[in-house]
Amino acid sequence: MKRILTFVLALSMALSLAACGGKADDNKGKTEVTMTAQEIMDTLKEKLGDSFGCDVAETEDNISGYWGLDMGQVESWASMSNSNSAVNSSYAVIVKVKDGYAQDAAALLQTGYEQILSYSRMYNMDLQKVLQARLFVNGNYAVLLILGAQGDWEASDEVQAKFAAEEAAKVDEAWRGIFGSADNGITIPEEDVSNNGGFFDMTDDEGKNDPVLGG
């Protein structure tokens, strides 16, 4: 009788452990986060160190103006860039929004990103880092991250691209440490070589290649 009871107890414990293991697997990559946007920004800054790259806090006007976000839908936000933005494109925008607005916020971040990318392509400025941008949507958080240490601008495109990818992997790791997953939703539009991304029309009315502002 004792043997039977011992066997039953052992079997019950084994089944319980298996069930717990199943729950752990189901929740893998689905970490519940309640941090504010600023707390997430501070965590990224701490984790990334020199690979963070941002040193200037942006204003709310920038969030609602340049990025076009509806502040009535935003519960908390944080945004930083680099003080030498002419040559360093590091940027981080984090918003925690109300239910149902995360995808809309992500679409606006994508639009703003495309303008940054056009500028980088035009001047070949920090381009490889910009091409490694991250757009994350986790629950009610929407985030655009263009982060990474500065590479060697005199290196070949291949070397710069490799370095930027390695830096972006650090961003993924830091984000995964907070949310459990790092699924990048950024879309990289094809380069429009006909008009330099829409900033300038490089031909005048006679078809010459003299720069003309505005288009």
Please report, for each region that a protein language model flagged, where it lies by residue.
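C-terminal motif of bacterial Sec signal peptides marking the signal peptidase cleavage site
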Residues: 15-19
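Sec-dependent signal peptide recognition
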Residues: 2-10
